[in-house]
Amino acid sequence: MSELRLCCDLLVQQVDKTKEVTTTGVSNSEEGIDVGTLLKSTCNTFLKTLEECMQIANAAFTSELLYHTPPGSPQLAMLKSSKMKHPIIPIHNSLERQTELSTCENGSLNMEINGEEEILMKNKNSLYLKSAEIDCSISSEENTDDNITVQGEIMKEDRMENLKNHDNNLSQSGSDSSCSPECLWEEGKEVIPTFFSTMNTSFSDIELLEDSGIPTEAFLASCCAVVPVLDKLGPTVFAPVKMDLVENIKKVNQKYITNKEEFTTLQKIVLHEVEADVAQVRNSATEALLWLKRGLKFLKGFLTEVKNGEKDIQTALNNAYGKTLRQHHGWVVRGVFALALRATPSYEDFVAALTVKEGDHRKEAFSIGMQRDLSLYLPAMKKQMAILDAL
């Protein structure tokens, strides 16, 4: 990549020199310098280096790496991309639709990633150039297995009940001429679930503890639950962002499981590392939480654009990126993002991927349901981000 950058700089210099010669009419041939030959040589080197970079990129995104499952990987709560020809993956079954709360023997947040990807994650801090096979599950001690599963189901049932109450309230206010279009919800009309209403754990489920403490386990579970949104944009398009989110979730959880009794909130984890003078150490939980927050803000910004009526997914993503992650990325990462934007799906395909039942996106009730769900989900997400900003 450094060679490519060098070629770019040389090209700029030599093009400027050529323009200068053309304008002044003065040639450097007396000095033995043929600007045209130099420019041609640099162009050839640039194209050759660019071709090598593309070969490396293609090798990184081969289907073998994207879909290889490590031997013995757990099958619960798999956040992965299906081997479908279509880049958008509708969530037609529970494994694709949600991140389940389950347990493992050491009570950790499992994220199974193949060896090739592990090497990349060790060499990159905040962006990774491969997709992953991820097992994302939050758990407690072995004797609370059933409780966690039940709690996840209760949270989902409570959310569905809240949605029905929300719809009834909208119905009652439907006669108000100043009511927004989504308020025009007629009683008895079909209620269609969406990706956001069927999450096992959502940011809207989080109950803050004393002093606005964000419960660590519930927060990490909510983060895992929203990661599949990136899959709805295509299995490889935003693999780098997905890998970044997943790795940072894992780092925070690794800190959490070292002392669950003490690190009940995110604030306590940060305070502990600040007092130990390790908060700014590479791969610390505090650093991971910082990048996790940035990634979540990007997702929130994108979903807000969609909720506000932006029908061009590329524009929605670009606007969200410009307001959040772009300022933290160098020119190389920005270039990768620009390339990823070219492969984004249409609005119709993206919305179709957020359905629970195939074909629901064609119904008017689904659009109303999306507005309803995002109206509950995004403010809750914003609240968590505001608390993290204050840390």
Swiss-Prot record:
Superkingdom in the source lineage: Eukaryota
Protein name per UniProt: Putative protein PLEKHA9
InterPro entries given in the database record: GLTP_sf, Glycolipid_transfer_prot_dom
GO BP annotations, alphabetical order: ceramide transport; intermembrane lipid transfer
Region forming the signal peptide: none
GO molecular function: ceramide 1-phosphate binding; ceramide 1-phosphate transfer activity
GO cellular component: cytosol
Pfam families xrefs: GLTP (PF08718)
